[in-house]
């Protein structure tokens, strides 16, 4: 199974989608991406369903190693994005080869960076969403599950 290995964590990252819209009456918040238009842009660029899971990265990105070839998009807040130490543009499709290293720096404008992968992140769906909400979704720490 293709995976992304987290080599260095940024400030805070989580998996998000369009959220849980019908569970507030039982105390479950909407959740979902904080900048839905940026998440949608990444999914659209990759021809993913708009509700495909994305990684939401707050303020400071990390370093990620790809095990297989794929396509990604990085949208949202402006930041330094490098693949194999080569600066790349945001808001476009980026081709990734097995063994490529993605490094995201701190944001220079905005708060939320979105890492979007072709097909979306494969995570559990709970109450109709893949969005992280710590009271109902699995709690992982970097050393518990360094591969995604």
Model-found features: residue ranges?
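Conserved "landmark" site that anchors the functional core of diverse proteins
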Residues: 1-148
């Amino acid at each position: 199974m293709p995976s992304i290995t987290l080599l260095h964590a940024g400030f805070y990252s989580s998996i998000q989608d369009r959220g849980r819209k019908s569970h507030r009456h039982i105390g479950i918040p909407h959740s979902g991406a904080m900048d839905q238009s940026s998440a949608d842009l990444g999914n659209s660029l990759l021809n993913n369903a708009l509700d495909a899971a994305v990684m939401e990265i707050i303020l400071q990105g990390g370093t990620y190693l790809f095990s297989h070839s794929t396509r990604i998009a990085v949208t949202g807040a402006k930041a330094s994005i490098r693949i194999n130490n080569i600066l790349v543009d945001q808001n476009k499709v980026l081709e990734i080869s097995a063994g490529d290293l993605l490094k995201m720096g701190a944001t220079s404008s905005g708060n939320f960076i979105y890492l979007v992968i072709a097909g979306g992140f494969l995570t559990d769906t709970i109450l109709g969403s893949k969005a992280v909400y710590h009271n109902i979704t699995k709690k992982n720490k970097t050393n518990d599950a360094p591969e995604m």
